[in-house]
Amino acid sequence: MAFALRGVTAKASGRTAGARSSGRTLTVRVQAYGMAAEYIWADGNEGKPEKGMIFNEMRSKTKCFEAPLGLDASEYPDWSFDGSSTGQAEGNNSDCILRPVRVVTDPIRGAPHVLVMCEVFAPDGKPHSTNTRAKLREIIDDKVTAEDCWYGFEQEYTMLAKTSGHIYGWPAGGFPAPQGPFYCGVGAESAFGRPLAEAHMEACMKAGLVISGINAEVMPGQWEYQIGPVGPLALGDEVMLSRWLLHRLGEDFGIVSTFNPKPVRTGDWNGTGAHTNFSTKGMRVPGGMKVIEEAVEKLSKTHIEHITQYGIGNEARLTGKHETCDINTFKHGVADRGSSIRIPLPVMLKGYGYLEDRRPAANVDPYTVARLLIKTVLKG
């Protein structure tokens, strides 16, 4: 590669060498860099007014390396960023530390480039207050590990036109046909934004994320993808990486994706959630229904603790309508999508399996969901 600026030319040619001057042109031989690593983290602005209805908490920046590294996070150095610009520090002491914890292939740039999920640490070396992954790590002891918790995360999102902020595919200044034909819909009259949803699914697969599927949702312009089944730390990492990919691909499509729990508050329209399927080893074996019932009883006693951490703005979604239970009520049932905790019918018929927590909003922190379920079910 060659760089020229104001009569200065630099040519990449193997190892770094000296500079050679010839007239007004300075030629510098430099090492060609061979890999880009996108360091990704969650900021401290989620839910703040300046974010509006977008609820996008993802940040990232690129670090280049001379030679490709592997997929082991320990190979990647810590890095820093300006926390005063992300809601994570004051200007007079603004440096925060990024520590790599998960590395996957970058499906956009392609191999050997990578995406690097990071935890955020304060200058004193302690986990930052926004580092919810660290809080999850702390609760995973030998007992939790032995229970081999599995999670399946149903991430809903709503597409918005970049220029207008209007829901993608909706008529300008108006509403589409009533809900009904759009859930798992097919055809230009029913499915809005499929190219982005498909591109996102493909990117997640290429990155090696455990994405289980996608579907158009009840409200037009609303989609869902599923991550899992995976363990607790993998759940948080993969949901956050998948969210970053969704936002990044949206740049190319001119579509903004929002995790706002209730993007349309006028009319008969569904909200946007993140139903979380959860099981322990004891739930997944014959006779596990008893363990599931015990877990539901524990969850009924910690409803307020969960609901206050299940996403900002969730009260607008959990109204008792549109396949939700009222936010102030705890209810469970078999095949009941108006419940707080749903037991799928096949689980009841088999007598073992998993439960579905239908309370989390689309903008919920996945590390927090994983931690609270462990805390209540296994440590309560």
From Swiss-Prot:
Chief site of localization: plastid
Specify whether Chloroplast is a keyword of the entry.
Answer: yes
Q: Which residues cross the membrane?
A: none
For the protein in the UniProt heading, the enzyme class is: ligase
Q: Which SUPFAM superfamilies match?
A: Glutamine synthetase, N-terminal domain, Glutamine synthetase/guanido kinase
Question: What EC identifiers does the entry list?
Answer: 6.3.1.2
Keyword list, A-Z: ATP-binding, Chloroplast, Ligase, Nucleotide-binding, Plastid, Transit peptide
Q: Where in the cell is it found?
A: Plastid, Chloroplast
**Record-stated family:** Belongs to the glutamine synthetase family.
Name recorded for this polypeptide: Glutamine synthetase, chloroplastic
Query: Which organism does this sequence originate in?
Result: Chlamydomonas reinhardtii
